Amino acid sequence: MSQSNQPDSPVTQTQAEEAVRTLLRWAGEDPTREGLLDTPRRVAEAYGDWFSGYRDEPREYLERTFEEVAGYDELIVLRDISYESHCEHHMAPIIGKVHVGYLPRGKVVGISKLARVVESYARRFQVQEKMTAQIAQCIQDVLQPLGVGVVVEGAHECMTTRGIHKRGVSMVTSKMLGSFREDARTRAEFLQFIEVGGKR
């Protein structure tokens, strides 16, 4: 978490559990009844998992690279990276997939590291557009490739379980940097590789 986003003092597990009890009472429940006695602890632990990205520095995952790639200088694409996030407006789940591509400039990174970058940004309160840009910019800043493309698909529970109640709707966002933005052929090749919403 960046320094500017940190609270003045860390919130304890006990304080987090008490906040859950307050929400239960606000909803009209009795947090002392048997079925809810362990709920505050369980919710706090679940939040610790769901928002573990705040304890990560995504750039560190990309620092170990491989420069001996036998002159490989073509597109590298990792598609269908599943993710789970939560929208910062309603704290409702966002579930979807991320597709990442980059055109290396002399060095590549292990593919699991790209997935870890996605996971690190997803496990925070997010806006999909922002998350898309964060993933792309992180890869561009650390690997300094010729270009980066990121496409994110997301189903937003804040739209399906409340408000307009529209199911089966998927939001798609993209961020193109470098050659992916400037060269239509590179961009088209990337989009053909991932075929968002199409048959594979």
Curated annotation (Swiss-Prot):
Subunit annotation: Toroid-shaped homodecamer, composed of two pentamers of five dimers.
Pathway, per record: Cofactor biosynthesis; 7,8-dihydroneopterin triphosphate biosynthesis; 7,8-dihydroneopterin triphosphate from GTP: step 1/1
An individual GO BP term: one-carbon metabolic process
One cellular-component annotation, GO: cytoplasm
HAMAP family with a match to the protein in the record: FolE
Protein family membership: Belongs to the GTP cyclohydrolase I family.
Uppermost EC category: hydrolase
Sorted UniProt keywords: GTP-binding, Hydrolase, Metal-binding, Nucleotide-binding, One-carbon metabolism, Zinc
Alphabetical list of InterPro entries matching this protein: GTP-CH-I_C/QueF, GTP-CH-I_N, GTP_CycHdrlase_I, GTP_CycHdrlase_I_CS, GTP_CycHdrlase_I_dom
Keyword Hydrolase among record annotations: yes
GO molecular function: GTP binding; GTP cyclohydrolase I activity; zinc ion binding
Enzyme nomenclature, EC number: 3.5.4.16
A UniProt-annotated Pfam family: GTP_cyclohydroI
NCBIfam families listed in its UniProt record: folE, PRK09347.1-2, PRK09347.1-3
Family matches, as SUPFAM superfamilies: Tetrahydrobiopterin biosynthesis enzymes-like (SSF55620)
Catalytic reaction equation(s): GTP + H2O = 7,8-dihydroneopterin 3'-triphosphate + formate + H(+)
Protein name per its UniProtKB record: GTP cyclohydrolase 1
Protein residues bound to Zn(2+): 87, 90, 158
